A protein has these predicted regions:
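N-terminal secretory signal peptides that target proteins for export/translocation
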Residues: 1-20
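Short active-site neighborhood of thiol/selenol oxidoreductases, capturing the structured segment around
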Residues: 79-99, 106
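Thiol-based oxidoreductase modules, predominantly thioredoxin-like and allied folds used
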Residues: 119-132, 149-158
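A short beta-strand-turn-helix
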Residues: 65-85
Length: 221
């Protein structure tokens, strides 16, 4: 079943390029209930065949302050504009369905980057900032063996909503948030938006394509 909000998101005028392809992720198949929350394209396959939609957007990073998991108050544009490619998702720590799968994908992607992992900035922004304190985010990050290149962020409710709206994530309720991963090669470049569950291998392929890295330059293990 495709909701009205899903249809609206799929037909957003900001899309410059889009494609739909089958996801190969076993967790996605096992978590059928989670896929219901993903932003699906208007034309979809049956629910038993999860889909991944890849599009390109020009997002404006909002000038908001967030609190990093180390307790430091930071400006989001500065965090994203440190020269590294950015891989971004939105989670909350008490989520028991979608978020653990998304974070596990990040964890495996981080491993597959190998020696190049410190060249990428992985970012997870909480959509439940009232509950997700920096201490809780640190505990959550440890569960997924997040390295120093993968940071988690909280802040005020207003700042979290501004970030969600800026990147087309906001769905009105944290329990129905979309399964979206966003990638950007460098400041000022367009964002690659991946809607739906993607395997760590597929995410690595998208990353390589985005930054123009030769296949052998990123460890795959």
């Amino acid at each position: 079943m495709v909701t009205a909000s899903a249809r609206a998101a799929a037909s957003s005028p900001g899309v410059r390029r889009g494609s739909v392809r089958s996801a190969l992720s076993a967790p996605a198949i096992a978590a059928g209930v989670c896929v219901m929350n993903a932003v699906l394209p208007v034309s979809v396959a049956p629910a038993t065949t999860p889909q991944v939609r890849v599009s390109t957007f020009q997002y404006a990073v909002p000038a908001i302050q967030l609190v990093r998991d180390d307790g430091k108050v930071v400006w989001l544009p500065q965090e994203m504009d440190d020269g590294r490619p950015v891989v971004l998702n939105f989670i909350f720590t008490t989520c028991s369905s979608v978020c653990p799968l998304m974070s596990q994908i990040f964890a495996q992607f981080q491993q597959k980057l190998g020696a190049d992992r410190d060249k990428v900035h992985l970012m997870s922004i909480s959509i439940d900032p009232e509950e997700d304190t920096p201490a809780r985010l640190r505990e959550y990050a440890r569960k997924f063996h997040a390295g120093p290149e993968w940071q988690h962020y909280t802040g005020t409710v207003e700042a979290s909503l501004a970030a969600q709206r800026a990147f087309g994530i906001y769905r009105g309720d944290k329990m129905s948030h979309a399964v979206v991963t966003l990638l950007r090669a460098a400041p000022g470049q367009p964002w690659r938006r991946i809607e739906g569950f993607v395997t760590p291998e597929e995410l690595l392929t998208e990353y390589r394509h985005l930054v123009g890295a030769p296949r052998g330059s990123v460890a795959s293990r």
